[in-house]
Protein backbone atom coordinates (compact mmCIF):
# COMPACT_ATOMS: atom_id res chain seq x y z
CA UNK A 1 0.00 0.00 0.00
CA UNK A 2 1.44 3.35 -0.99
CA UNK A 3 0.70 6.92 0.01
CA UNK A 4 1.39 10.12 -1.88
CA UNK A 5 1.50 13.37 0.10
CA UNK A 6 -1.01 16.07 -0.76
CA UNK A 7 1.21 18.85 -1.98
CA UNK A 8 0.57 21.77 -4.27
CA UNK A 9 -3.19 21.32 -4.26
CA UNK A 10 -3.52 22.79 -0.75
CA UNK A 11 -2.54 23.73 -3.42
CA UNK A 12 -1.72 -2.58 -17.55
CA UNK A 13 -0.89 -4.01 -19.33
CA UNK A 14 -4.40 -5.52 -19.57
CA UNK A 15 -4.62 -9.14 -20.67
CA UNK A 16 -6.44 -8.60 -23.96
CA UNK A 17 -5.44 -9.34 -27.50
CA UNK A 18 -6.18 -5.89 -28.89
CA UNK A 19 -4.52 -2.55 -28.12
CA UNK A 20 -6.61 -0.20 -26.01
CA UNK A 21 -7.09 3.40 -27.16
CA UNK A 22 -7.14 5.83 -24.27
CA UNK A 23 -10.57 6.83 -23.03
CA UNK A 24 -10.96 10.22 -21.44
CA UNK A 25 -12.48 10.89 -18.03
CA UNK A 26 -11.74 13.69 -15.58
CA UNK A 27 -12.63 14.00 -11.90
CA UNK A 28 -12.19 16.89 -9.46
CA UNK A 29 -12.93 17.31 -5.76
CA UNK A 30 -14.23 20.69 -4.60
CA UNK A 31 -14.46 21.75 -0.94
CA UNK A 32 -16.75 24.63 0.01
CA UNK A 33 -15.95 26.96 2.91
CA UNK A 34 -18.77 25.44 4.96
CA UNK A 35 -17.14 22.00 4.64
CA UNK A 36 -19.39 20.62 1.91
CA UNK A 37 -17.55 18.39 -0.54
CA UNK A 38 -18.66 17.74 -4.10
CA UNK A 39 -17.09 15.42 -6.64
CA UNK A 40 -17.39 16.41 -10.30
CA UNK A 41 -16.67 13.91 -13.03
CA UNK A 42 -16.89 13.85 -16.83
CA UNK A 43 -17.45 10.64 -18.78
CA UNK A 44 -15.89 10.46 -22.23
CA UNK A 45 -16.21 7.42 -24.44
CA UNK A 46 -16.58 6.60 -28.12
CA UNK A 47 -19.17 3.84 -27.86
CA UNK A 48 -22.54 5.11 -26.57
CA UNK A 49 -22.88 4.16 -22.91
CA UNK A 50 -26.70 4.36 -22.81
CA UNK A 51 -26.36 5.03 -19.09
CA UNK A 52 -29.17 4.90 -16.56
CA UNK A 53 -29.36 6.40 -13.10
CA UNK A 54 -30.08 3.54 -10.72
CA UNK A 55 -31.33 3.84 -7.14
CA UNK A 56 -31.09 0.56 -5.26
CA UNK A 57 -32.06 0.00 -1.59
CA UNK A 58 -30.23 -1.95 1.08
CA UNK A 59 -30.56 -5.72 1.34
CA UNK A 60 -29.66 -6.54 -2.27
CA UNK A 61 -28.22 -10.07 -2.52
CA UNK A 62 -25.28 -10.23 -4.93
CA UNK A 63 -22.85 -12.79 -6.28
CA UNK A 64 -19.84 -12.18 -8.51
CA UNK A 65 -19.72 -14.68 -11.38
CA UNK A 66 -16.10 -15.56 -12.12
CA UNK A 67 -14.59 -16.06 -15.60
CA UNK A 68 -15.04 -19.84 -15.34
CA UNK A 69 -18.78 -19.37 -14.71
CA UNK A 70 -18.66 -20.38 -11.07
CA UNK A 71 -19.67 -18.26 -8.09
CA UNK A 72 -17.19 -15.98 -6.41
CA UNK A 73 -17.79 -13.69 -3.46
CA UNK A 74 -21.36 -13.24 -2.24
CA UNK A 75 -22.69 -10.31 -0.24
CA UNK A 76 -25.85 -8.57 0.91
CA UNK A 77 -25.70 -4.81 0.56
CA UNK A 78 -25.46 -2.79 3.77
CA UNK A 79 -26.11 0.58 2.13
CA UNK A 80 -28.54 1.92 -0.41
CA UNK A 81 -26.81 3.24 -3.52
CA UNK A 82 -27.36 5.63 -6.41
CA UNK A 83 -25.19 5.22 -9.49
CA UNK A 84 -24.87 5.50 -13.26
CA UNK A 85 -24.50 2.25 -15.17
CA UNK A 86 -23.32 1.65 -18.73
CA UNK A 87 -23.34 -0.68 -21.72
CA UNK A 88 -26.57 -2.34 -20.62
CA UNK A 89 -24.92 -4.14 -17.70
CA UNK A 90 -25.30 -3.61 -13.97
CA UNK A 91 -21.95 -1.96 -13.34
CA UNK A 92 -21.43 1.24 -11.36
CA UNK A 93 -19.55 3.65 -13.59
CA UNK A 94 -20.00 6.38 -10.98
CA UNK A 95 -22.09 6.79 -7.87
CA UNK A 96 -22.46 7.21 -4.12
CA UNK A 97 -24.15 5.47 -1.23
CA UNK A 98 -26.46 6.66 1.53
CA UNK A 99 -23.47 7.14 3.87
CA UNK A 100 -22.12 9.71 1.42
CA UNK A 101 -19.28 7.53 0.13
CA UNK A 102 -18.41 8.35 -3.49
CA UNK A 103 -16.91 6.03 -6.08
CA UNK A 104 -15.70 6.77 -9.59
CA UNK A 105 -14.60 4.21 -12.19
CA UNK A 106 -12.27 5.75 -14.78
CA UNK A 107 -10.62 4.11 -17.77
CA UNK A 108 -7.00 3.02 -17.17
CA UNK A 109 -5.77 1.53 -20.48
CA UNK A 110 -2.31 0.09 -20.88
CA UNK A 111 -1.67 0.04 -17.15
CA UNK A 112 -4.45 -1.96 -15.48
CA UNK A 113 -3.51 -5.54 -14.65
CA UNK A 114 -5.76 -7.52 -12.39
CA UNK A 115 -4.93 -10.32 -10.02
CA UNK A 116 -4.48 -14.05 -10.69
CA UNK A 117 -7.35 -16.28 -9.64
CA UNK A 118 -5.05 -19.28 -9.33
CA UNK A 119 -4.86 -20.37 -5.71
CA UNK A 120 -7.32 -17.71 -4.53
CA UNK A 121 -10.32 -18.49 -2.35
CA UNK A 122 -13.42 -18.24 -4.49
CA UNK A 123 -15.38 -16.87 -1.56
CA UNK A 124 -13.02 -13.86 -1.55
CA UNK A 125 -12.67 -13.44 -5.33
CA UNK A 126 -14.63 -11.14 -7.65
CA UNK A 127 -14.47 -9.79 -11.19
CA UNK A 128 -13.44 -6.18 -11.54
CA UNK A 129 -16.79 -5.18 -13.08
CA UNK A 130 -18.42 -5.91 -9.71
CA UNK A 131 -15.90 -4.06 -7.54
CA UNK A 132 -17.51 -0.58 -7.70
CA UNK A 133 -20.91 -1.81 -6.50
CA UNK A 134 -19.25 -4.01 -3.89
CA UNK A 135 -17.51 -0.97 -2.42
CA UNK A 136 -20.59 1.26 -2.51
CA UNK A 137 -22.87 -1.38 -1.01
CA UNK A 138 -20.57 -2.39 1.84
CA UNK A 139 -18.52 0.53 3.14
CA UNK A 140 -19.01 3.98 4.66
CA UNK A 141 -15.41 5.16 5.03
CA UNK A 142 -12.13 5.19 3.14
CA UNK A 143 -10.45 3.30 5.98
CA UNK A 144 -12.96 0.46 5.63
CA UNK A 145 -12.18 0.23 1.91
CA UNK A 146 -8.42 0.27 2.55
CA UNK A 147 -8.79 -2.55 5.06
CA UNK A 148 -11.04 -4.68 2.83
CA UNK A 149 -9.31 -4.52 -0.56
CA UNK A 150 -6.11 -6.43 0.36
CA UNK A 151 -8.31 -9.32 1.51
CA UNK A 152 -9.95 -9.62 -1.94
CA UNK A 153 -8.72 -11.10 -5.19
CA UNK A 154 -9.93 -8.97 -8.11
CA UNK A 155 -9.73 -10.60 -11.55
CA UNK A 156 -10.44 -9.42 -15.06
CA UNK A 157 -13.28 -10.68 -17.21
CA UNK A 158 -14.10 -10.18 -20.89
CA UNK A 159 -17.15 -7.97 -21.35
CA UNK A 160 -19.26 -8.84 -24.44
CA UNK A 161 -21.14 -5.52 -24.26
CA UNK A 162 -17.83 -3.70 -24.76
CA UNK A 163 -16.22 -5.51 -27.69
CA UNK A 164 -15.36 -8.38 -25.35
CA UNK A 165 -12.43 -6.55 -23.78
CA UNK A 166 -11.31 -6.75 -20.18
CA UNK A 167 -12.31 -3.30 -18.94
CA UNK A 168 -9.18 -1.51 -17.72
CA UNK A 169 -10.21 0.70 -14.82
CA UNK A 170 -8.93 2.47 -11.76
CA UNK A 171 -11.08 3.90 -9.02
CA UNK A 172 -11.52 6.88 -6.72
CA UNK A 173 -13.20 6.68 -3.33
CA UNK A 174 -14.15 9.74 -1.25
CA UNK A 175 -15.81 10.34 2.11
CA UNK A 176 -18.15 13.30 2.73
CA UNK A 177 -15.30 15.22 4.42
CA UNK A 178 -13.17 14.96 1.26
CA UNK A 179 -10.79 12.24 2.42
CA UNK A 180 -10.04 10.24 -0.71
CA UNK A 181 -7.99 7.43 -2.19
CA UNK A 182 -7.13 6.16 -5.65
CA UNK A 183 -7.19 2.39 -6.22
CA UNK A 184 -5.14 0.88 -9.05
CA UNK A 185 -4.41 -2.73 -9.97
CA UNK A 186 -1.17 -2.92 -11.99
CA UNK A 187 1.71 -5.31 -12.64
CA UNK A 188 2.89 -4.34 -9.15
CA UNK A 189 -0.35 -5.57 -7.59
CA UNK A 190 -2.89 -3.57 -5.60
CA UNK A 191 -1.87 0.06 -5.10
CA UNK A 192 -3.76 2.51 -2.90
CA UNK A 193 -2.77 6.17 -3.00
CA UNK A 194 -3.98 9.23 -1.14
CA UNK A 195 -5.86 11.40 -3.62
CA UNK A 196 -4.76 14.95 -4.39
CA UNK A 197 -8.33 15.66 -5.49
CA UNK A 198 -7.88 15.16 -9.23
CA UNK A 199 -8.01 12.05 -11.41
CA UNK A 200 -7.90 11.27 -15.12
CA UNK A 201 -6.62 8.17 -16.93
CA UNK A 202 -3.28 6.54 -17.73
CA UNK A 203 -0.45 6.56 -16.82
CA UNK A 204 -0.46 5.45 -13.18
CA UNK A 205 -1.44 7.96 -10.50
CA UNK A 206 2.06 8.68 -9.12
CA UNK A 207 3.18 9.82 -12.57
CA UNK A 208 0.43 12.43 -12.76
CA UNK A 209 1.15 13.74 -9.27
CA UNK A 210 4.87 14.01 -10.01
CA UNK A 211 4.08 15.79 -13.28
CA UNK A 212 2.37 18.58 -11.34
CA UNK A 213 5.84 19.69 -10.23
CA UNK A 214 6.38 20.93 -13.79
CA UNK A 215 3.55 23.44 -13.37
CA UNK A 216 4.13 24.99 -9.94
CA UNK A 217 4.57 28.36 -11.67
CA UNK A 218 0.95 28.51 -12.81
CA UNK A 219 -0.74 31.46 -11.16
CA UNK A 220 -4.03 33.32 -11.24
CA UNK A 221 -2.19 36.66 -11.08
CA UNK A 222 -1.16 38.30 -14.34
CA UNK A 223 2.56 38.58 -15.03
CA UNK A 224 4.20 41.92 -14.23
CA UNK A 225 5.57 43.97 -17.13
CA UNK A 226 9.32 43.79 -17.65
CA UNK A 227 11.83 46.20 -19.17
CA UNK A 228 14.61 44.93 -21.43
CA UNK A 229 17.18 47.40 -22.75
CA UNK A 230 14.80 50.22 -22.08
CA UNK A 231 11.89 48.56 -23.87
CA UNK A 232 8.81 47.65 -21.81
CA UNK A 233 7.03 44.36 -22.42
CA UNK A 234 3.60 43.71 -20.92
CA UNK A 235 1.23 40.77 -21.21
CA UNK A 236 -1.57 41.16 -23.71
CA UNK A 237 -4.93 40.84 -22.02
CA UNK A 238 -5.80 38.68 -19.03
CA UNK A 239 -4.55 35.25 -18.01
CA UNK A 240 -0.78 35.51 -18.45
CA UNK A 241 -0.28 33.83 -15.07
CA UNK A 242 -1.61 30.64 -16.62
CA UNK A 243 0.67 30.80 -19.63
CA UNK A 244 1.90 27.27 -20.30
CA UNK A 245 -1.11 25.42 -18.91
CA UNK A 246 -1.72 22.44 -21.23
CA UNK A 247 -4.90 22.74 -23.25
CA UNK A 248 -5.15 19.46 -25.14
CA UNK A 249 -7.53 16.58 -24.26
CA UNK A 250 -4.83 14.07 -23.25
CA UNK A 251 -5.01 12.61 -19.71
CA UNK A 252 -1.83 14.38 -18.48
CA UNK A 253 -3.07 17.73 -19.82
CA UNK A 254 -6.53 17.34 -18.31
CA UNK A 255 -5.02 16.36 -14.94
CA UNK A 256 -2.91 19.53 -14.82
CA UNK A 257 -5.69 21.76 -16.11
CA UNK A 258 -8.27 20.47 -13.63
CA UNK A 259 -5.76 20.67 -10.77
CA UNK A 260 -4.91 24.29 -11.58
CA UNK A 261 -8.56 25.29 -11.90
CA UNK A 262 -9.56 23.60 -8.63
CA UNK A 263 -6.66 25.16 -6.73
CA UNK A 264 -6.75 28.68 -8.18
CA UNK A 265 -10.51 29.27 -8.43
CA UNK A 266 -12.18 31.51 -5.86
CA UNK A 267 -13.40 29.60 -2.83
CA UNK A 268 -17.11 28.88 -2.71
CA UNK A 269 -19.23 29.35 0.43
CA UNK A 270 -21.56 26.38 0.23
CA UNK A 271 -22.85 23.34 -1.66
CA UNK A 272 -24.49 25.35 -4.43
CA UNK A 273 -21.29 27.26 -5.10
CA UNK A 274 -19.18 24.09 -5.03
CA UNK A 275 -21.51 22.39 -7.48
CA UNK A 276 -21.36 25.40 -9.77
CA UNK A 277 -17.55 25.50 -9.62
CA UNK A 278 -17.30 21.78 -10.37
CA UNK A 279 -19.39 22.26 -13.50
CA UNK A 280 -17.18 25.14 -14.65
CA UNK A 281 -14.03 23.06 -14.14
CA UNK A 282 -15.54 20.20 -16.12
CA UNK A 283 -16.34 22.69 -18.88
CA UNK A 284 -12.59 23.19 -19.33
CA UNK A 285 -12.08 19.51 -20.22
CA UNK A 286 -15.21 19.01 -22.34
CA UNK A 287 -14.61 17.10 -25.60
CA UNK A 288 -16.98 17.84 -28.52
CA UNK A 289 -17.84 14.93 -30.80
CA UNK A 290 -15.32 14.55 -33.61
CA UNK A 291 -12.45 16.51 -32.06
CA UNK A 292 -10.74 13.35 -30.76
CA UNK A 293 -10.45 10.38 -33.13
CA UNK A 294 -8.82 6.97 -32.93
CA UNK A 295 -8.44 6.73 -36.72
CA UNK A 296 -8.30 9.04 -39.73
CA UNK A 297 -11.41 7.41 -41.25
CA UNK A 298 -14.01 10.15 -41.44
CA UNK A 299 -16.67 7.68 -40.32
CA UNK A 300 -14.74 6.87 -37.16
CA UNK A 301 -15.23 9.01 -34.05
CA UNK A 302 -13.29 8.82 -30.81
CA UNK A 303 -14.15 9.99 -27.35
CA UNK A 304 -16.63 12.73 -26.58
CA UNK A 305 -18.17 13.94 -23.34
CA UNK A 306 -21.30 11.79 -23.04
CA UNK A 307 -22.25 13.03 -19.58
CA UNK A 308 -21.00 14.70 -16.44
CA UNK A 309 -22.04 14.15 -12.84
CA UNK A 310 -21.53 16.28 -9.75
CA UNK A 311 -22.15 14.54 -6.44
CA UNK A 312 -22.96 16.57 -3.33
CA UNK A 313 -21.75 14.12 -0.69
CA UNK A 314 -23.20 16.02 2.27
CA UNK A 315 -26.72 16.36 0.91
CA UNK A 316 -26.74 13.12 -1.14
CA UNK A 317 -27.75 14.89 -4.35
CA UNK A 318 -26.47 13.90 -7.79
CA UNK A 319 -26.47 16.49 -10.57
CA UNK A 320 -25.99 15.47 -14.18
CA UNK A 321 -26.14 16.66 -17.76
CA UNK A 322 -25.59 14.92 -21.09
CA UNK A 323 -24.08 15.71 -24.46
CA UNK A 324 -27.50 16.14 -26.03
CA UNK A 325 -29.08 17.97 -23.10
CA UNK A 326 -26.79 20.42 -21.35
CA UNK A 327 -29.46 21.47 -18.85
CA UNK A 328 -28.40 20.45 -15.35
CA UNK A 329 -30.77 17.98 -13.68
CA UNK A 330 -30.66 16.49 -10.19
CA UNK A 331 -31.71 13.40 -8.25
CA UNK A 332 -32.07 13.60 -4.45
CA UNK A 333 -31.16 10.29 -2.86
CA UNK A 334 -32.84 11.24 0.42
CA UNK A 335 -36.26 11.08 -1.23
CA UNK A 336 -36.05 7.32 -1.78
CA UNK A 337 -36.89 4.52 0.62
CA UNK A 338 -33.62 2.64 1.13
CA UNK A 339 -34.94 -0.04 3.48
CA UNK A 340 -34.56 -3.71 2.46
CA UNK A 341 -37.34 -4.78 0.14
CA UNK A 342 -38.05 -1.26 -1.11
CA UNK A 343 -38.38 -0.65 -4.83
CA UNK A 344 -35.44 -0.21 -7.20
CA UNK A 345 -35.69 2.79 -9.56
CA UNK A 346 -34.01 3.52 -12.91
CA UNK A 347 -34.07 6.34 -15.45
CA UNK A 348 -32.10 6.86 -18.68
CA UNK A 349 -29.81 9.89 -18.49
CA UNK A 350 -30.28 10.70 -22.17
CA UNK A 351 -33.29 12.64 -23.36
CA UNK A 352 -35.28 15.19 -21.42
CA UNK A 353 -36.89 18.48 -22.29
CA UNK A 354 -33.73 20.05 -23.66
CA UNK A 355 -31.29 22.74 -22.66
CA UNK A 356 -33.10 25.80 -24.00
CA UNK A 357 -35.68 27.79 -22.04
CA UNK A 358 -37.62 30.39 -24.02
CA UNK A 359 -37.71 33.55 -21.87
CA UNK A 360 -39.16 35.85 -24.54
CA UNK A 361 -42.24 36.50 -22.41
CA UNK A 362 -40.02 37.74 -19.60
CA UNK A 363 -39.04 40.87 -21.52
CA UNK A 364 -41.02 43.95 -20.41
CA UNK A 365 -41.45 47.34 -22.03
CA UNK A 366 -39.03 49.96 -20.77
CA UNK A 367 -38.58 53.63 -21.41
Region locations from a protein language model:
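Positively charged n-region of N-terminal signal peptides that target proteins for export
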Residues: 1-6
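Bacterial N-terminal signal peptides
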Residues: 7-17
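C-terminus-biased signal that marks the final domain/tail of proteins
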Residues: 23-38, 46, 52, 157-159, ...
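A contiguous strand-loop segment
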Residues: 24-123, 156
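Short, surface-exposed beta-strand-loop junctions and turns on beta-sheet-rich folds
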Residues: 45-47, 109-111, 188-190, 324-328
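Short helix/loop capping segments that flank catalytic or ligand/cofactor-binding pockets
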Residues: 48-49, 112-114, 181-184, 191-195, ...
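Proteins synthesized as precursors that undergo proteolytic processing into mature forms
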Residues: 121-158, 271-280
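Aromatic- and glycine-enriched pocket-lining scaffold segments that form the walls
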Residues: 142, 146-185
Amino acid sequence: MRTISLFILALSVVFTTLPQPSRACTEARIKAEDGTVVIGRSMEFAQPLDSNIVVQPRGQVNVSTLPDGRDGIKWTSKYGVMYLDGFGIDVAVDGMNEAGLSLGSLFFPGAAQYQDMKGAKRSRTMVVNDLPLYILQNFATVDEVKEALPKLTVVGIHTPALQNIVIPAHFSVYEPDGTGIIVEYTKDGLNIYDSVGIMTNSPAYPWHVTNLNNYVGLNSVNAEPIVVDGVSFAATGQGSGLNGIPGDPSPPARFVRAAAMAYLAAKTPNADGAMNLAVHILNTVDIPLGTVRDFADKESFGDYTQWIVVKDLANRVLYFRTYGNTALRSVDMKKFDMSPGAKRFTMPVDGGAGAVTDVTAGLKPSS
